[in-house]
Amino acid sequence: MIGDMEITKGEDIKSYALEVGYKKQEKDLFRVSIVDKELNQEQIILRNDAGVFVVTPSLNQIFKFEGNWPLNSPKPYLLQSIVEIAQKKEAKVEKEDDGYLVSSRVHYPNNKNFYREEIMFDKEAKVKWLQIYNKDDVAELKIAFKKVKYDAPIKDTYFDVPQTLDKKASVSAIQEEDLPLYPMMLHGAQLTNTSRMNINGKVKHVLEYSGDANFTVVQMKKDSVEKTQTVIMPGQMIDVLDMVGFYDGNHVSAIYDNVEFTVFSEDLSPDEMMSVITSMQVAVMK
């Protein structure tokens, strides 16, 4: 399936090109490509017989995870999730001139704002578009599918992990001088201290928060490596559509626009720590 995806966070709207491939076999194969149109940065998530991989050409790195992605939680762009929603008992189906409109309450564990979803199918039951709304009935996610083929023949090599990555020219919106970014999602905490550390020529920015929940944010600009690297990632992968993070013990890390964000906390859940990181995309606060 090929389409365009829009994610709205407050006044910020991000546009992505989306391509999803799936092949059913003893161990199902998946490939999801998400390209940030503004930054021209691509991230590919693969599942094959060797495991789960997040391919990040802008850093020339491949991250390998354990786990059952993507079937461990629903994903709006997955046909399996779309069908599951359409088949819910409480789903409402309305016949339209050009197909069928399905509407249902939804629950996405990694996207707690998502409340209600509409899915439009054509007369041949091919999905045309979907929109997900929050409790205020504001659309936070839109996907318009341009090409949909069920049971299309796909070669196994489509799901192979690339040995070398093509570092396409990309635009980085976040520069070193923009750091640190400040999260909007604070979980009842307030900023109590900021500091900088210089480690091996790299600057790490540290933000400490205290209150209902205590947590620390560390952020650092990442440089692309010369030779393609595969990095084995410990812990649990967390996928929030436009960003992939991993949880290991008391912290969650994620890379966005070549900046590595890490949240340390004994009080926040993995999803709450990830929500702190994703809230930094909305605005640069000084």
What are these regions (language model features)?
Residues G21-P76, N134, V138-K147:
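An acidic-aromatic
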Residues V32, L130-I132, V263:
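Beta-strand-dense domains in secreted/periplasmic systems and polymorphic toxin scaffolds
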Residues D137, A144-K146, Y150-I154, T262-K286:
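Surface-exposed amphipathic alpha-helical segments
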Residues P162-D257:
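Short, solvent-exposed recognition patches
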Residues D97-Q163:
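Gly/Pro-enriched, hydrophobic low-complexity segments
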Residues R47-N111, Y115, I154, F159:
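Flexible, processing/modification-adjacent segments and terminal tails
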Residues I13-L18, L39-E42, K112-E117, A139-K142, ...:
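Short, surface-exposed coil-to-beta transition loops
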Residues M1-I13, F30-V32:
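A short, Trp-centered hydrophobic/proline-enriched beta-strand micro-motif
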